Amino acid sequence: MKQYKVAILGATGAVGREMMKVLAERDFPVSELHLLASARSAGGVLPWKERDITVELACDEAFAGMDIVLGAAENDVAKRFAPAIVRSGAVFVDNSSAFRMDPDVPLVVPEINPEDVKKHKGIIANPNCTTIVSLVAINALNQDSPIESIVASSYQAVSGAGAGGPIELMNEVEALGLGQQIEPKVFQYQIAYNVIPQIGGEAFDGYTSEEMKLQNEGRKIMHLPELKVSCTCVRVPVVRSHSVSLVVRTREKISVERARQLIAAAPGCRLVDDLANKRYPMPLDTSDQDLVFVGRIRDDLTSENGLNIWCCGDQVRKGAATNAVQIAQLLVK
């Protein structure tokens, strides 16, 4: 089997470290693994498989000879290095939002639109984590009858805001238990024992940038240019795994039983739907998992062809690192 030279840009962050883990778990054919980061992190050492790898400084020259570069860095870093990566001949699988809506860049969820990988011109974008979790959960419905609209409410874990999110949550819980004052730094308000109904800045007509991603990215991934989505994104005091409540309206009626059958057979999904026995998806159960758990499937009482669905997925794994490695697997298939 052919082996590939792989680099991870932003290797020392949470997603970069998870990419290392997933590459090993999936036995990706790596001949060389290069870990790239800022000057602050360069020179450090990270374990991978049975050896230690020294973190290198991210610079244009670092991509020479690479076959695949997995991006786990912020938008500005992705934009800064993308030209050098493409010039080097490597394919850049980027987890940032920098290129997602570029018409020349495929936006890929392997369970949904794997064929779009072939359209790349050197860059393939990884979708937003909430988009991935939501669309994997409902793609089987779209294959049965086209989805016309979605109303979504997301319950997003603090780790989605970076490594500082869980630390701030734990520190606040401890401080409040001791009767101490807290000063939020990562989030705009106290997150312990609270929910914050804003993720991202205002983008369009009262919607935030995070909320518009599900519509904009969903249209591109599912090839549904007329898809309408109304979304509210909420930060909740959960450490890991995002949850999403979805009202999905399809062109033709899909029964609850048919929906359960479709989702149970769908790649990337696990049906957990037994209300009588209190079995349904929860963040605790999906953390450190690659599958999206789907349940609470029931008719929407406000529309003819609507279904209510609840899903949970690990935003660091399937929502980021695993999806990127799956794209890399498609590239070498």
Regions found by a protein language model. Give the residues of each.
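N-terminal Rossmann-like NAD(P) cofactor-binding subdomain of oxidoreductases
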Residues: 1-191, 227-228, 292-293, 297-303, ...
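Charged docking surfaces used in two-component/phosphorelay signaling
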Residues: 9, 69, 158-333
